[in-house]
């Protein structure tokens, strides 16, 4: 597997992975994290434009897509409740990670490669996304507290540092 920046040629594959991920989350008891059409092809294209959309490719097939931004200043991470961040150093963020195949270690690989590139990463997930919470903890992310999105929705915040 390899991680690489997404290109316009990847948009359809990434959008399909997001469609399948929304269905997977609904079936797994998490119908509220990604509502409606979010995330979608427009989000992938926006990330391509600012250099933050990535894909994981295996034998020429796009098997995962995600947003990875270095030196982020995510406004929703400025305040954290019921805990604290591990440090106040510059950080990277991972958002919108989704995979085509489950149980093959694809998310673990993506997180590992991101951490090799940047050793201070923040990420959040919905309280009902139990599979992602387990993956985050398995991959060395530590729960830090609760953050609120701009629309007021609550998320569980995690961080992994060197």
What do the PLM-derived regions correspond to, one by one?
Residues 67-102:
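Conserved acyl-donor/pantetheine-binding loop and adjacent beta-alpha core of acyl/acetyltransferases
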Residues 23-42:
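Conserved GNAT-fold acetyl-CoA-binding loop/helix
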Residues 124, 142-156:
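Conserved catalytic-core motifs of GNAT/GCN5-like acyltransferases
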Residues 99-116, 134-138:
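Conserved acetyl-CoA-binding loop-helix of GNAT-fold acetyltransferases
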Residues 2-16:
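A short beta-loop-alpha structural element at the N-terminal edge
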Residues 50-68:
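Conserved beta-hairpin
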Residues 42-55, 72-75:
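A short helix-loop-beta-strand connector motif used in the catalytic cores of GNAT acetyltransferases and
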Residues 116-128:
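Conserved GNAT acetyl-CoA-binding A-motif
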